[in-house]
Amino acid sequence: MKLKITLLFLFIALYTNAQSKDLKFGKISEQEINLTQVPFEKNADAVILSEEGKMDLTSSNYYLTVKRRIKILTDKGLDEANIQLNYYSKNRNESISGIKGSTINIVNGVEQITPIDEKEIFDVSLNELYAAKRFTFPNVKVGSIIEYTYIKSSEYNFSIDAWNFQHDIPTLSSKFRLNNQAYGTYSIITIGDGLNTKYKGKSSSTEWLLHNIQSYNQLKYVYNPEDQSERVKIQAATYHTDGAKKTTMSAWRDLIQDINAQYDLYRNPSAIRDVAQNIPNGKDEVETLKNVIEYIDSNVKWNRFYGIIPTRSNKTLLKEKSGSTADMNLLLNEILTAKGFETSMVMFSSRHHGQILFSYPIVNQFNSVLTVVKLNNGTSNIILDASKLNKEQIEFGPLDVFNYHGIVIKKGDASFVKLNQKLSYYESSLKYDFMSNGNLVLYRKDKFNGYFYDDDIDEKNVLNRYLTESLDVRLDEEINDKTVFDTDSYVKNYKAKTVIPNAPFYTFINPLREFLKQYTFEDTNRQRKIEFNYPYLFNIQVKSKIPEGYEVIIDEKYKAHHKTELGLEYYQEAKVKDGQFTLAIQFLLPEGVYEADKYNELKQFFEKIKTESLKEVLMKKK
């Protein structure tokens, strides 16, 4: 086995060295023909054997020439033969041309080349802004090699997503060259651990080359794997809003003033006053806020469009009953202001859209807006998105909006705000009762809030999403109440029982054990921030009366308490008192994001607590 693995990686090393040369279509190697599996991502359905990009950048546009060669490894990989090349079609400022390609099969040791038929290349409209070139390779099967080339031209040369080295399938070799003939000043932004390690201190590079790149789906602890993938961006020292071009000296201020001015065209406090008056006030500000949320949720719906600038007035929105995120949040903001709340509208980039680069005030970094409401005399903030309101847990905004920072839409200087998440809480109580009639009964009650609950939750699997039962005994369900919201948490009650044999022993395991197994840390040179979905706290208690004739054996090393300077904390303890066995477990992850240099500290902490969670408690016959 060692020899086989060594030979596989030797092949990859030889292959990638060969691919450092320019990719020439129609000339495939024995290594490419014989490749059936990617050693560093063995479950891959297809692999990019080699790809090259060359960009000619001028002061008015750019031309990107792409060459790519892919091998199909499994039946699922056949989808890679369907190609879609998107481009910005409005005003015809972008285009894709020069598409050529072919399928290569080896039949009886001879190359069989089937070219793409130009008549089978289609130009399709995706929406009012974007179009795409679509084509499908002919005669494709498992083992086929497909290769294609095209040229993308664009007049949008102020903020360019120049080249992606990492894709949704692994890549053996990826090369990008830049020929900068522009007169203006441009910054090269490299994203990804591989690029930033290899080209650290080489800011003047015009050629980049990476080998053996895992698919971005393999990236762990990132909100948006594609956004955090290995790639190069090219950024001009200017920005555009609706055709305007401005220097970066006071660019953020200018940008937000432009946005705010467009909002002023749609703000109409007097028109919304009557609407606000018809929404009843509650006994306190929280109840009033909930009444406003109920009104928005009942009267307008999201049309599935994200936007940073409204396209409808409040009156039109209420009449049409459907609008974009910008339309809906403007209405929410205006009503709350009329009800006496202190509010702000914040422009942000959602997790699925990508992170903001603060050094470059570009409006297309943002894709939506949200509403921030101050409560308790300004001591607490509630983050709301009118398009995705949580009527029961108003303090927990949509998870997708929590992507570091946003910028307040207002007059004056630019003001960035951090979008902080509230801690989600999970409490579970498991009580085992060994009955004198030979039955074992489990009474379980779980309470949870925040992001431990979502609308897509499967009622049958609510209790199995995060915790397992402590006794590995098959129980028959007796009571399985529907999950209900009570005051500030969701509550689930469950009862099950079984007839048990007169077993010599029973083993109590840690209910959090399986959940903790997902936390693996395998990066060797992490340079990305570590992003967890949300901060949380677990509080778990297992209880059981000790049956007559049995005793509980607790290892003296079972008790554990681990705490880090980062605030993470884990505690477990087992004890016996007055004939009852109790197991207590707590786990706190206080923040959603940690800096890259904390990776090893996090790794060590999780390895410790995973080891602790493997410990068991034995209840055996005396």
Residue ranges and their predicted role:
Residues 131, 157, 255-261, 271-281, ...:
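Glycine- and acidic
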